[in-house]
Amino acid sequence: MSALNLTVRVHPVVLFQVVDAFERRNADSHRVIGTLLGSVDKGVVEVTNCFCVPHKEHDDQVEAELSYALDMYDLNRKVNSNESVVGWWATGNEVTNHSSVIHEYYARECNNPVHLTVDTSLQGGRMGLRAYVCIQLGVPGGKTGCMFTPIPVELTSYEPETFGLKLLQKTVGVSPAQRPKTVPPMLDLAQISEASQKLQSLLDLILKYVDDVIAHKVTPDNAVGRQLLDLIHSVPHMTHEQFTQMFNANVRDLLMVITLSQLIKTQLQLNEKLTFLPTA
């Protein structure tokens, strides 16, 4: 498959690690680079992890601690053998003159490595994210070169990562002095209540869009219409009585789990107090 047909999907933990490495950089370092880890399947490069590689850039050369990169990769393989080298990342919003030299090293580590740039300067108030592949240029028997060509990049996340992002959003706009250092886990019923309120707000937003389209206040979008149609078809067909019975059964199961967990917690606390009682 051609490198130009690749699509890059980046998980949030990768961006967090890039920002953390940028904040911990040396005072004389203007750019931070590192290795991207993940998997490639059917033209999709899924980046699930990364680590920083110490390096120094001079006017005419680049010095990178390749032995450190190999050691970090070997350690990561012991923890997660499914993650392989898929490319490399760098902070900044552009490809520099030294990028081709670094990319040449990663081309020996994997096929069609991708280059991810993360704009940690937040130009325009956003963290710019771009992905590139290197395309060889030249004529047969002549001098060859390479050109970094942009490819599609998007953010994706697993379900646990989505929950973590939602918790982080609760601290947005809160001053550092008032920002809590820890976030206690929510009770199951509180999570259901919060999810129901969010679902209700999303339904209100959809209904407003449909009403505006019918009233010719908004130009209809065919892509949105197809997604709404798929959403309607995904709703299971059942009567009101069947839905009520299924919902009540799930609520009873949830309450039973909560009750058992509270009993176990009480028993553990009682056992702990009995353990530390002085013996006669």
Curated annotation (Swiss-Prot):
| Keyword field | Cytoplasm, Initiation factor, Protein biosynthesis
**Cytoplasm keyword on record:** yes
**Superkingdom of this entry's organism?**
Eukaryota
Matches recorded under SMART domains: JAB_MPN
InterPro entries given for it? eIF3f (IPR027531), EIF3F/CSN6-like_C (IPR024969), JAMM/MPN+_dom (IPR000555), MPN (IPR037518)
Name a GO CC annotation attached to this entry.
eukaryotic 48S preinitiation complex
Asked if the Swiss-Prot or TrEMBL record annotates the protein with the keyword Metal-binding, the reply is no
Q: Provide one Gene Ontology biological process annotation.
A: antibacterial innate immune response
Instruction: Please report any disulfide bonds recorded for this protein chain, giving both cysteine positions.
Output: none
Where along the sequence do coiled-coil regions lie? none
Spell out the subcellular localization from the entry.
Answer: Cytoplasm
Q: Which GO terms describe its molecular function?
A: metal-dependent deubiquitinase activity; translation initiation factor activity; translation initiation factor binding
Q: Which residues form the MPN domain?
A: 8-138
Subunit comment? Component of the eukaryotic translation initiation factor 3 (eIF-3) complex. The eIF-3 complex interacts with pix.
Task: Name the family.
Answer: Belongs to the eIF-3 subunit F family.
Summarizing the function annotation, the protein's role is: Component of the eukaryotic translation initiation factor 3 (eIF-3) complex, which is involved in protein synthesis of a specialized repertoire of mRNAs and, together with other initiation factors, stimulates binding of mRNA and methionyl-tRNAi to the 40S ribosome. The eIF-3 complex specifically targets and initiates translation of a subset of mRNAs involved in cell proliferation.
* Entry-linked PANTHER family: EUKARYOTIC TRANSLATION INITIATION FACTOR 3 SUBUNIT F, EUKARYOTIC TRANSLATION INITIATION FACTOR 3 SUBUNIT F-RELATED
Instruction: Write down what this protein is called.
Output: Eukaryotic translation initiation factor 3 subunit F-1
